[in-house]
Curated annotation (Swiss-Prot):
Functional summary from the UniProt entry: This protein binds to 23S rRNA in the presence of protein L20.
Subunit structure as annotated in this protein's UniProt entry: Part of the 50S ribosomal subunit. Contacts protein L20.
Keywords noted in UniProt: Ribonucleoprotein, Ribosomal protein, RNA-binding, rRNA-binding
Top-level taxon of origin: Bacteria
Taxonomic lineage from the root: Bacteria, Thermotogati, Thermotogota, Thermotogae, Thermotogales
Family to which this protein belongs: Belongs to the bacterial ribosomal protein bL21 family.
GO annotations of cellular component type: cytoplasm; ribonucleoprotein complex; ribosome
Natural source organism: Thermosipho melanesiensis (strain DSM 12029 / CIP 104789 / BI429)
Name of this protein: Large ribosomal subunit protein bL21
Gene Ontology MF terms in the entry: rRNA binding; structural constituent of ribosome
Swiss-Prot/TrEMBL GO biological process terms: translation
Amino acid sequence: MYAIVESGGKQYRVEPGKVFFTERILGKNEGEAITLDKVLMVKTDEGKLLVGKPYLENVSITGTIVEHGRARKVLVGKFRPRKNYKRIKGHRQWYTAIKVENIEVK
């Protein structure tokens, strides 16, 4: 069984027992339970495919927040030829790791 869920403006494929990384979720601490309600699609173990318009109302995904952290540094550079101008800037994006416990179809 797997599902497509929307979190942080992006879509993720999630399965029970797996960990996925999403944009940082504020207001929740590590170890707390979380419920994701914006489920776009579910494929059940019986092979049944449920698709929402845009979301499924009878499906919820429960999970646990594993950690909050920052991703690896991404370097962005500007360069102007023949002008002796060069600029490097780094960025580290915040993320939240969520372990999916259960996909419940009501």
